[in-house]
Amino acid sequence: MMTTTSRYAALSRAELATLVPELLLIGQLIDRSGMAWCISKFGREEMLQIAIEEWAGSSPLYTKRMQKALNYEGVDVITVFKGLQLDIGAPPQFMDFRYTVHDRWHGEFHLDHCGALLDVEPMGEEYVRGMCHDIEDPTFDATALATNRKCQVRPIHRPPRAPADRHPHCAWTVIIDESYPEVDFVPQLEIVAASRAYHTELAPIDPSDEGLADYSGPLLSDVDFGAFSHSALVRIADEVCLQMHLLVLSYHLAVRARANGDAALEESIRYKSLIGIAGVAAERIKNALGLSADTKGALRVLELHPLMNPAAYVSVDVDPDFLHVRRSPAYEDGAWISLVSPVADLPLQAIVAAVNPYLRAEVSGTETDWTVRVVETDTAAKELPEVEVCKFSGGASWEFENRKSLPLTVV
């Protein structure tokens, strides 16, 4: 079967090594956008349940995809830890997981820095407890069950922090034991597993390409994305975009279950959530790759944006002067792109304004077949409120640092 050429393939190996952690962080920030609208419409308790269902309904699926893509399938704690390092739920440094391996079945991790905690602490103890207890208990196990259904992730200590500056932010044990009951899959998982996103075929990694073709070697303290081959980085970037789409499909199911048949309410929440992350993602991509603040730079950001990727899932014809979006598997899933059209263009406006507030997107065509051009104007656009909400997260302005990548041996 022919596979579509990735839009990330045109980037250099160095650019991809910069972009991949950005994409992982963007995936984490999806919730900073989405959960704000869930709190305002459904309240805090329902927001917690939405978050649990959202992650539990997607992370086992995308974790398995990444294991296969990078050839590190297994059943032990090392496999669990490798998966977390390539998971939008645990972007590097912003969620600074430090791992200890005692043996194949026993390990620990602690967070030297938890960006999500620092985002939530100002909101009060109820929100901290909700995230670090109510959400994490089922979702850590759900992520681990992709590797081994008899894996239990349990807290050593976790927030609310006492004292208030306690460090590390939290610590957990990860134990696999045959005597443990199997962790159950949530019912939503079956629906998300039937999606076109989950079954998207991406080009295999070329083992002859210079650099690492997989993550079958030792577990590393920090993944050095620069050590991977160009081919592997293209695949990782596409997989991370699919992680986002699977998470959002699961989020949509959870929102729909609470909208009680109110299609307008459901669509409004989904749309606002997309606008927020669209703008924040665009700004990070533009800055990370040092793209120009003109129409050309804006079109490049659109082309590389998770909204439009991977190419095998979202069909876009790229021209020097415009992008032409066509019907694709993403439309069948009701993915992000299905929320955008000539009469619903705010996600595109958020993207181009993040590149330069004097730019506007001009969109023409039908709901599922449209063209976007970028034009210069004389008036700076005011930042959209949905983007402002997403920027509440420290992740929106996070700066990555260079780190040494060291193999972790059994203690």
Language model segments and positions:
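N-terminal accessory segment detector
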Residues: 1-108, 115-135, 141, 145, ...
